[in-house]
């Protein structure tokens, strides 16, 4: 995932976390889930995902305050954002601090190579 931008990576991490059974409206925002969410760029990511039907704002929330899955997890995959974005960035250090991994990131999260996509 080293080829994803930081904001897209945090957005996808947050959406995966929410898809794990947590209700979007219970969360203060995706930044609380993933740590230091880069606020200026995250609204663009979520708007782009909303247009594609990948996410939706939680009832009563602002543009990016709370997001939920826009479609069933069976029809989504974690490779969707990587197909949409191809810009390179160095974000292994950021992934190592991701709250989703509970301070134990898997090897693929901090390696320099991107996973292969089908």
Curated annotation (Swiss-Prot):
UniProt superkingdom: Bacteria
Start-end of Low complexity biased regions: 71-83
Region ranges (Disordered): 25-85
Protein name, UniProt field: Uncharacterized 12.3 kDa protein in nifK-nifY intergenic region
Upper lineage: Bacteria, Pseudomonadati, Pseudomonadota, Alphaproteobacteria, Rhodospirillales
């Amino acid at each position: 995932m080293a080829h994803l931008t930081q904001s897209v990576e945090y957005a996808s991490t947050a959406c995966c976390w929410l898809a794990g059974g947590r209700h979007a409206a219970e969360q203060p925002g995706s930044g609380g889930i993933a740590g230091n969410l880069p606020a200026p760029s995250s609204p663009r990511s979520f708007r782009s995902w909303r247009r594609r039907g990948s996410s939706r704002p939680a009832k009563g929330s602002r543009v990016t305050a709370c997001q939920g899955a826009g479609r069933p997890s069976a029809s989504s995959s974690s490779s969707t954002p990587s197909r949409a974005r191809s810009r390179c960035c160095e974000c292994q250090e950021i992934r190592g601090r991701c709250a989703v991994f509970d301070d134990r990131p898997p090897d693929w999260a901090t390696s320099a190579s991107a996973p292969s996509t089908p």
